[in-house]
Amino acid sequence: MILFENVSKAYKVHRHMKPVFNNLNFRIDRGDAIGICGANGAGKSTLMRMLAGVEPQTGGRIIRTMSTSWPIGFTSAFQMGLTGADNARFIARIYDRDEDEVLAQVEDFAELGDYLYQPVRTYSTGMQARLAFGVSLTVDFECYLVDEVTGAGDVRFRSKSENALMERRERAALVMISHDPGTLQQYCTKGAVLYGGALTFFDSISEACEVHYGLQTLAR
């Protein structure tokens, strides 16, 4: 379970606090597959970092009783001066996994070749996403957070990523951000719309996408 109780978030901008969220109240349980819709700048990535526990809230309370991945695609989790392999080994130590086993899994899945042994700062955005996705799959989380990662790589790699994500969705919670409604509808059953600092949930991902695009149309 991940529970948000009256959670707010604000950033200090030029001596003033700029609110991002106000009084968010929701719960995510194991087995949920939730797609989050929102315009650029609405705070989707901030929300994902808060779900992961890497971004503190300004007010309210967040309770976590299940293990949660870092946001897949959130490459700031890596040490850019280290190689991809060293980052994988570091993650293995954090989660008490066998380092050689984790490295072998990442090498096989991410398909980075010799680049796996080069500093992450030399990677393209797509290569960083491959590494993030590959490393995340070496840990059995109870909730996976996905931020626009499945578009990385060629058709074959995307297909492999999709299959891996679908397999984990069967036994864990999934929270996904994507600008593509087709992707959200492929993976998610429920939806939420982030708009004006509020997060509104819908029983259907299709309904959430429809409301989101309706709001976007009105804003134009």
Name each model feature, range by range.
Residues 30-35, 39-93:
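ABC ATPase nucleotide-binding domain signature region
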